[in-house]
Amino acid sequence: MADFQKILIANRGEIAIRVMRAANELGKRNVAVYAEEDKLGLHSFKEDEAYKIGEGLGPVAAYLSIEGILRVAKACGADAIHPGYGLLSENPDFVDACTEAGIAFIGPKAQTMRQLGDKASARRVAIEAGVPVIPATEVLGEDMAQIKAQAAAVGYPLMLKASW
């Protein structure tokens, strides 16, 4: 594990507080970001430093602003970003942007997110790795004859899941 000294937590509320607690236990400095609507939120007071993001944006858009979060990370000298969960935590473009900015992303690699980010791709990765999987089909189109044939081949009962 890399030795980060200052971690920007790119999330809000209880999620940010939980990440902050863990980082504090490791002796790391924490940086909070907060949207205007969260300026009185506990996470913006519990961190070592706190910076407002997303001027003129709503709260969700503020926390989804890759540019805004990276701007704060660079300005305050954070050497790592922890995304928490939700928001940018599953966005491979955010991971790429952190890497390009020279800031470590605490989480999976962008390639891993891309491979496992949808059910069909994740299934192929599992099969290639030798992980047992239940019978299924590849993503089907709109040809009802093909769909019926694939359903019969897999067997009943069936469970249908959207793949995108």
Label the model's feature ranges:
Residues 1-164:
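N-terminal beta-alpha lobe that positions the nucleotide/phosphoryl donor
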